[in-house]
């Protein structure tokens, strides 16, 4: 190195110069990781240069690739520049001592040696500090490069996800637009007397849930093939309107299949005593999976029910419990969530007209049917009106049957049976007779008990009842159509029945 050559030319026989030569060798060994160079510039002034090589880069990065990191390194470089100036000052002091030695001979050699040793030790410490700081800067720089690469990769992934989401949204929008172009026009408009805000909520639910409804499929027998009369659904023969005892239940006929998970079990119904503006075709449906169940889908026409286009979505002011709801004379009757209260909700005005506690009735899992589902309180309709099926602590889980006033929900009459509620899967009433289903999952279930409120006598039966889809969560009787309505594992089905004369 030039600095070493300069030192050695001053006289190798002198001890001080030998020590300085040793310092030059030590300095040269340290130059493997850093270089300290001394040279004259164009104007003849002496300049000292300290150089550090990058351990990982063959060339310097562009300014636009690591501007932030470079700015940080520049701040650290200014600190090191100050340290370097201090080192230069010490070197100048060392040169001054050498000059004294060369001009003054051997005089004061001991003092000069001590001064040189002190200066050499200080220079070594300065060099070690600078090397440590340089390594720290290299590590920090490498970390910044890694962080920059990671951020760029994350940005690329987010951009790709954004493109995928935009593509999916566009596809969904096109599908919804296509489906809506074929949607049946709504024929029923919300009442002007509906609860404040319910119109907006109903419309919102129609927009978001109709798309799921559109995916529902008809299976087994198309509903259009079994709708034989002008009104759009089967009717009893004119001479077959009298009451009787249940003798036979036909094969299940599937009208609709719900695809969404909320359709695992639920309740669907038509009004056996319809009032304006509703007709014999108007159908209601409630998916009862989950909690906070408040949505009631209304279909004004059979075709809307077939195709999955609700004409309206009611939002109940209070959540309902399980699958025991019925529609009768223009009102929806249901059990309030986690309570023994039965409510009457007038569908046309969207208002609660009456509510009443069923005295002592078990609720929320105390006395459900065999399949569970919080089916403690089950409402039913027959030729004579509205009924409620439940149990109490006093009857130790046996079924209690009460006749309800449809206007104010007062109990008019009550019967206690000897049929344990949790031993049967479901129950319904025909002509004042309570019938129970033996199993909710067996394909070869039976109508196994009957309790006659006219005589107070119960008896066992073995009328075949097929659970085709092996999870019947609701069975109700419609006296207008003389059919059983059921919800069997996502499927809305009906059963023809035969009654004998009483």
From Swiss-Prot:
GO terms for biological process?
Answer: bone development; cellular response to nerve growth factor stimulus; clustering of voltage-gated sodium channels; ERBB2-ERBB3 signaling pathway; myelination in peripheral nervous system; negative regulation of cell-matrix adhesion; negative regulation of Rho protein signal transduction; negative regulation of stress fiber assembly
User: Where does it primarily localize?
Assistant: secreted
Q: Which InterPro entries match?
A: Olfac-like_dom (IPR003112), Olfactomedin-like_domain (IPR050605)
Q: In which tissues is it expressed?
A: Highly expressed in skeletal muscle and retina. Also detected at lower levels in thyroid gland but not in other endocrine glands such as the adrenal or pituitary glands.
Question: Which portions of the sequence form the region Disordered?
Answer: 166-198
- Give the free-text PTM comment from the record: Palmitoylated. Undergoes a calcium-dependent proteolytic cleavage at Gln-225 by CAPN2 in the endoplasmic reticulum. The result is the production of two fragments, one of 35 kDa containing the C-terminal olfactomedin-like domain, and another of 20 kDa containing the N-terminal leucine zipper-like domain.
Q: Where in the cell is it found?
A: Secreted; Golgi apparatus; Cytoplasmic vesicle; Secreted, Extracellular space
The record's listing under Pfam families reads:
OLF
Q: How does it assemble?
A: Homodimer (via N-terminus). Can also form higher oligomers. Interacts with OLFM3, FN1, NRCAM, GLDN and NFASC. Interacts (via N-terminus) with MYL2. Interacts with SFRP1, FRZB, FZD7, FZD10, FZD1 and WIF1; regulates Wnt signaling. Interacts with SNTA1; regulates muscle hypertrophy. Interacts with ERBB2 and ERBB3; activates ERBB2-ERBB3 signaling pathway. Interacts with SNCG; affects its secretion and its aggregation.
**What is the protein name for this chain?**
Myocilin
Source organism per entry reads Rattus norvegicus
